[in-house]
Amino acid sequence: MLAKFESMMSNKVQTDDDFTQTQNPFTLFASWLEEATISEINDPNAMALATVDETGLPNVRIVLLKNFNSTGFVFYTNYESCKGQEILKSMKASLVFHWKSLRRQIRIRGLVEQVSPEEADAYFQSRPYGSQIGAWASKQSQLLEDRFVLEKEVSRYTADYAIGNVPRPPYWSGFRIKPLFIEFWRDRPSRLHDRLLFTRDFLEQNNWKKQRLYP
């Protein structure tokens, strides 16, 4: 996983003082993610993804960050799934990273765009063969009569794509969350935690406003 984030992690933030001194939230994010990669037992790139349905009722689930840079945070999914449909309707989402081993969390809120077909194709071809077949076999979020039905679909697509590359399903791709708000939280004694909020008014704005928040 480190290789995917290498370009952002080269500007690693090391000291506690830099928590408040940094002016670039992506640099601080890269530093924290790199530390989490060392300290977290499983999936340091796991993040809670929050969306809302057409009635405004929220939904949240854990997904995996697959790439990030100064334009946003990328994950992949079935566009016909619940989360895919909710995002496509609102084009807004929120993320939370929580690293218990570091006693830190990051909240991200922003607008969403679809990744390019070329970007999605490249990532899909990097996935294990079984995961590629699963993307075809699973009608994500739809009702499943029993496990045998799913296994039959897996067998069917395994036979269909036994030779050569597995093409990316047309309904399977990625989203990029382009942040307007990024908040860093760090545990401190007596519940007097550190909170550092970066905001910008529009996506093209490169200069972030930085503010401290009461814990």
UniProtKB/Swiss-Prot annotation:
Sorted UniProt keywords: Flavoprotein, FMN, Oxidoreductase, Pyridoxine biosynthesis
Residues annotated to bind FMN: 61-66, 76-77, 83, 105, 140-141, 185, 195
Catalytic activity from the UniProt record: pyridoxamine 5'-phosphate + O2 + H2O = pyridoxal 5'-phosphate + H2O2 + NH4(+); pyridoxine 5'-phosphate + O2 = pyridoxal 5'-phosphate + H2O2
Oxidoreductase found in the keyword field: yes
GO BP, one annotated term: pyridoxine biosynthetic process
Cofactor(s) required for function per UniProt: FMN
Alphabetized SUPFAM superfamilies for the sequence: FMN-binding split barrel
Binding residues for substrate: 66, 123, 127, 131, 191-193
One GO MF term attached to the UniProt entry: pyridoxamine phosphate oxidase activity
Involved pathway(s): Cofactor metabolism; pyridoxal 5'-phosphate salvage; pyridoxal 5'-phosphate from pyridoxamine 5'-phosphate: step 1/1; Cofactor metabolism; pyridoxal 5'-phosphate salvage; pyridoxal 5'-phosphate from pyridoxine 5'-phosphate: step 1/1
Free-text remark on how the cofactor is bound: Binds 1 FMN per subunit.
EC numbers on record: 1.4.3.5
Described purpose of this protein according to its UniProt entry: Catalyzes the oxidation of either pyridoxine 5'-phosphate (PNP) or pyridoxamine 5'-phosphate (PMP) into pyridoxal 5'-phosphate (PLP).
Record text on subunit structure and interactions: Homodimer.
Similarity remark: Belongs to the pyridoxamine 5'-phosphate oxidase family.
Protein name, per record: Pyridoxine/pyridoxamine 5'-phosphate oxidase
